[in-house]
Amino acid sequence: MALGPGCRAVRGCRPVLKRAFSLHKAHSVKDMESILQLVRSVVPALTTKKHKGQDGRIGVVGGCREYTGAPYFAAISALKVGADLSHVFCTQEAAPVIKAYSPELIVHPVLDSPEAVRDVEQWLPRLHALVVGPGLGRDDALLENVKGILEASKARGIPVVIDADGLWLIAQQPALIQGYRKAVLTPNHVEFGRLSEAVLGVPLDGGDRHGAVLRLSQALGNVTVVQKGEQDVISDGEQVLECSQEGSGRRCGGQGDLLSGSLGVLAHWALRAGPQKTGGPSPLLVAAFGACALTRQCSQQAFQKYGRATTTSDMVAEVGPAFRRLFEA
């Protein structure tokens, strides 16, 4: 990414790359507010004229014997952000556990079935977005089924958020989402390094996170990439955003699932609203920024109450208040 003279040393300095801009670590409140305003513009109004399902039917693909919390956190977060219906497509062993967590989720025990792809594919016409990977695990048979589900989702043009072991699959087979611009990858530091090695053949450049995320997105054909970290760096290969909404120092497991579930809903809303509402940034960039800001705000609010004892369940309880504070105040 080309920068103006001395740009790296100047707070709030913007790159000169065409159509790209970056909100740096010490970006102005005005810049943050302008992006948050774009997120607000895609949030649908709650009215009595709507019917169930119009504001989002989200599917989460993941959940196995070892990992039942992750798909629950993603699916329940989608509901709390504002989706009307939230489905979980998991293994047979995981289903009773996830059902027991919440009666509000629609749980399908099909992911380890020989007919898993067909079973999930029949639901795709009813879904607005998929979140793939929370609690998936790395069983070869499950990954093969998820590969088929991804191909079917792409064929229907369904937005796909990929996290956790879904990213492991992409690192093994990047062609699965190459050029699919309705995909969003949400890697943490380790997952991003693995993707960078697999796609670019180079180790992670920790000194230039903005450039690293931009290059990975471009190499994948402008798939949106969210590198989670002290600040979240987001790029669609053309633009780069940085979200440094205040969060907390607590790093309990499950926060990424809250982000991915939230992002599934926001992606649907942003794509439905279209670029005329999101202005310069693409709809998925705006959605990703919104999900990052919301997750950080939930973390901050939960930490203020529980401090070191904060868990992701505490953060999920803050989704409603945090959403109102950021997007409906």
Swiss-Prot record:
Record PTM N6-acetyllysine, positions in chain: 49
Reaction(s) this enzyme catalyzes, per UniProt: (6S)-NADHX + ATP = ADP + phosphate + NADH + H(+); (6S)-NADPHX + ATP = ADP + phosphate + NADPH + H(+)
InterPro entries: CARKD, Ribokinase-like
Location, primary (coarse class): mitochondrion
Keyword Transmembrane helix set for record: no
Segment annotated as transit peptide: 1-28
Domain of life: Eukaryota
Keywords, alphabetical: Acetylation, ATP-binding, Lyase, Mitochondrion, NAD, NADP, Nucleotide-binding, Phosphoprotein, Transit peptide
GO BP annotations listed: metabolite repair; nicotinamide nucleotide metabolic process
Cofactor(s) listed in the protein's UniProt record: Mg(2+)
Location within or outside the cell: Mitochondrion
Modification sites for Phosphotyrosine: 67
Database matches in PROSITE patterns: YJEF_C_3
Annotated EC: 4.2.1.93
Record has Mitochondrion as a keyword: yes
Residues reported in the UniProt entry to bind (6S)-NADPHX: 135, 188-194, 257
Domain YjeF C-terminal: 35-326
One cellular component (GO) term of this entry: mitochondrion
GO MF, one example: ATP-dependent NAD(P)H-hydrate dehydratase activity
Pfam families: Carb_kinase
EC class: lyase
Protein family: Belongs to the NnrD/CARKD family.
Cross-referenced HAMAP family: NADHX_dehydratase
Cited function: Catalyzes the dehydration of the S-form of NAD(P)HX at the expense of ATP, which is converted to ADP. Together with NAD(P)HX epimerase, which catalyzes the epimerization of the S- and R-forms, the enzyme allows the repair of both epimers of NAD(P)HX, a damaged form of NAD(P)H that is a result of enzymatic or heat-dependent hydration.
Name of the protein described by the UniProt record: ATP-dependent (S)-NAD(P)H-hydrate dehydratase
Organism name: Bos taurus (Bovine)
Gene from which the chain derives: NAXD
